[in-house]
A protein has these predicted regions:
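A structural boundary/capping signal
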Residues: 1-240
Length: 240
């Protein structure tokens, strides 16, 4: 660039500027490449568990079940607002309403199995029930003696009605006609499903037979219940 004329203040001599243009090149230091990680949003944080189970008709399955962390805390907070002074049905419906749309990352495991395997309707119901039967039994340590469905998957343990409530949601998602059967006499909860089978372990409702299914422990088939709770007169449909 051209410099303007300068006056030498110590002499009377006029110093003319250089007419040659000078190019000044400024070299910037190379910047280090920094890879910034995008923070994980609350929508992307999960509790996850690899699961393995054997169906009651033979094949083994596996899958990654997960629930969003924010859904887990929502599940717990809703359940904590319930009390033992409510009816069982009131509490069950409350956790169902709060959690039923928060289980998509669990039901996706069953959707994959349904897509990949040519199972009958009876067999596919067993895939879901045997998955639940395989989750360890545990007594519940809260006021209403129930884990909400999302809470159940995260903790991966639960008691009888925790399991029947979870199955009620999931089986209905896949189009099964199910009810929850409770017995105050036996202090137990089992599933009732409207699928043809043999035997007399069923409750008749609205012209349909809902066959009992023991879902608390592994190995029980549709229509089977333990001998110590076999009297169907002591069972009632608590949720349909």
């Amino acid at each position: 660039s051209s410099w303007s004329d300068e006056i030498n203040t110590t002499s009377n001599t006029t110093i003319k500027p250089k007419t040659t243009q000078e190019t000044i090149t400024v070299t910037k230091p190379k910047s280090k490449s920094v890879t910034s990680q995008k923070p994980i949003s609350d929508d992307e944080k999960y509790f996850e568990k690899n699961t393995y189970w054997t169906t009651n008709f033979g094949p083994k399955h596996r899958g990654l079940v997960k629930v969003k962390q924010r859904d887990y805390y929502s599940s717990i907070n809703n359940r904590r607002n319930l009390t033992v002074y409510n009816t069982w049905k009131y509490n069950a419906l409350s956790v169902i309403r709060n959690d039923k749309y928060k289980l998509d990352d669990v039901t996706s495991v069953f959707k994959r199995i349904k897509r990949d395997k040519n199972y009958s309707r009876n067999q596919f119901a067993d895939v879901i029930v045997s998955f639940t039967q395989d989750i360890p039994y545990a007594l519940i340590d809260n006021a209403i003696d129930i884990y909400a469905p999302v809470e159940f998957i995260k903790k991966y343990k639960g008691d009888c009605d925790t399991k029947t409530i979870f199955l009620y949601i999931v089986l209905k998602k896949f189009g099964y006609d199910v009810v929850i059967l409770n017995s105050w006499h036996y202090g137990h909860s089992i599933l009732g499903i409207n699928l043809p089978t043999s035997g007399n372990n069923y409750k008749y409702y609205n012209g349909k037979r809902y066959y009992a299914w023991e879902t608390t422990y592994p190995g029980w088939l549709k229509g089977q219940i333990p001998p110590k709770v076999f009297n169907m007169n002591h069972w009632e449909i608590s949720l349909y």
